[in-house]
Amino acid sequence: MFNGEEVILFPERKTIPGAPGREIHKDAPAPKRPETKKTGDRLMDRMKKVDPNQSERYRQRTGE
């Protein structure tokens, strides 16, 4: 086409208007937050197995 060079046309990317300078593409999936569970409950259960009174002392010390 131009000076004997071949021109390659790419389809336009779909963008969502948002913060300037940061484009969000519809095609790319958004990263998701990893699933985390509250580990404090497990800690209390483990403490009760070792020493039932220790879990109560820990609860008082941490304010739970």
UniProtKB/Swiss-Prot annotation:
Q: Where is this region: Disordered?
A: 1-64
Residue ranges under compositional bias (Basic and acidic residues)?
22-64
Q: What is the lineage of its organism?
A: Bacteria, Pseudomonadati, Nitrospirota, Nitrospiria, Nitrospirales
What are the entry keywords? Answer: Isopeptide bond, Ubl conjugation pathway
Listed name of the protein: Prokaryotic ubiquitin-like protein UBact
| Covalent link (Isoglutamyl lysine isopeptide (Glu-Lys) (interchain with K-? in acceptor proteins)) residue numbers | 64
* Family per record: Belongs to the ubiquitin-like protein UBact family.
Q: Any idea which GO molecular function terms this record carries?
A: protein tag activity
